[in-house]
Every structure is written in C-alpha cells, then in structure tokens.
A protein has these predicted regions:
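Generic hydrophobic, amphipathic alpha-helix propensity
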Residues: 8-17, 33, 58-66, 132
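N-terminal intrinsically disordered/low-complexity leader segments
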Residues: 1-7, 74, 209
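All-alpha amphipathic helical-bundle segments outside canonical DNA-binding/catalytic cores
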Residues: 84, 120-124, 141-157
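Short secondary-structure transition hinges
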Residues: 53, 95-131, 153, 180-187
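Conserved hydrophobic residue
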Residues: 25-26, 116, 145
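C-terminal peripheral helix-coil segments that are non-catalytic and often amphipathic
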Residues: 95, 99, 129-142, 157-209
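Hydrophobic alpha-helical connector segments
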Residues: 72-102, 151-158, 209
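Helix-turn-helix
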Residues: 11, 19-53, 57
Length: 209
C-alpha cells in the first residue's frame, strides 16, 4: 500500500527535491532544506528520522506522483494509433528517468535494504508493463505490429540503455556534442531515445509508412 504523506511532509519533500536537483544529495544540507522550507532543523528528524531516510521518502513520493501522472498521460493518448502510443510511452519513461536522474545512485543502494521502495517501484513497473502489453496487442490487431514480444522485455529494453546512459557519462560524452551540462543531458537523452525507439519498433516488426 502506498504511504500517505501529510501536507507538511509534502512541503518539505518538494523543497528538498528542488535543492537536491540543483546541488545533489551530498551538496544539500539539512540546514538548507529546513531554512528554505521555513521549519526548524529538528522537524526533519521528527518527520523523517534523518537526511538519508528523507531521501528514501522523497523517492517513494516521486514514484507515487509519477505513477499518477503516467496514468493521466496514457489516458490522453488512448485514442491514438498504436505506434504513436508506443512512441509516446517510450519517450515519457525515458524523459522521467532523465528528469529525476539524481535519484539513481541513491536508489540502487537504498533498495537493497528498503522493502517499501521496492514495492513502489514494482507497482510502477507493473503499470508500465500492462500499458505496453495493451498497446502491443492493439498494434497486432491493427496490423501495424508484426511481432508481439513480452511487454516486460520491452520495458527492460527501455530502462536498460537509459540507466546505462545516465550512470556512465564519462563514456557517453565521447559520442555527443555539448558545451554545458544541460546540453549534455539533452543530447544524451535524445541519443538514447532514438536508439530505444529504433530497437523497440524493430522488435515489434513495425515499419513506418
């Protein structure tokens, strides 16, 4: 079951996320978070226990919000052609991973010992797999997809290259042109999206007309 956050906790988490996105987890202090949130430093301990536990709750909160937004997003494209739906779902997932890239190192470590984080993420993966399966079946029925790979394999094909790109900047930056960190992230995201779209549609046997 998803954790319910109070309004005060949500306020603190939103402030923390804004700061961590700019300065990183290590570069953001509890004092900075409490100052910007206009609360006493002790309130961080009261609501979350520690900075590390607050980060775990922040990730849990972000996954919950992303899951809600994904459901809303897929509703807006439900009447589109299957190939367009698949393209937009892929782009959405990749964009979300890049947007919240500052979580990934933390999440890999924290998930080894935090069961509720695993559960939140598994629920989101299951929703993604169900949507991908639905789109694939519609594409087969419409005759635009030739093959029907397992939906979990398609999700793996989306997540794998994206996470590799995010975690291996020193390697990827050899192959993209950029002059700022922001430009690098844009170009890296564009590169991996193009690769994943090509790979998934090849797996589906889809050929653009």
């Amino acid at each position: 079951m998803s954790k319910k956050f109070t309004d005060k906790q949500i306020h603190i988490l939103n402030v923390a996320e804004e700061l961590i996105a700019k300065k990183g987890f290590e570069g953001t202090s509890v004092r900075e978070i409490s100052s910007k949130a206009e609360i006493n430093v002790a309130m961080i301990s009261y609501y979350f226990g520690s900075k590390e536990k607050m980060m775990a709750y922040l990730y849990q909160f972000r996954v919950q919000k992303t899951r809600e937004h994904f459901a809303e997003f897929t509703e807006t494209i439900k009447d589109a052609k299957p190939q367009m739906q698949m393209r937009e779902v892929i782009k959405y997932i990749v964009s979300q991973l890049f947007k919240y890239n500052y979580f990934h190192g933390f999440v890999t470590q924290e998930m080894r010992q935090t069961e509720h984080l695993k559960n939140e993420l598994m629920e989101f993966y299951e929703i993604c797999v169900a949507k991908i399966d639905d789109i694939t079946k519609k594409g087969i029925a419409a005759g635009v997809f030739t093959f029907a790979p397992q939906p979990e394999d398609i999700l793996t094909l989306i997540l794998g290259p994206t996470l590799f790109t995010i975690r291996n900047r020193k390697f990827i930056e050899i192959f993209v042109v950029y002059n700022t960190d922001e430009k690098y992230m844009q170009e890296a995201e564009k590169k991996v999206k193009a690769y994943i779209l090509m790979s998934v549609f090849a797996l589906l046997g889809y050929v653009a007309q």
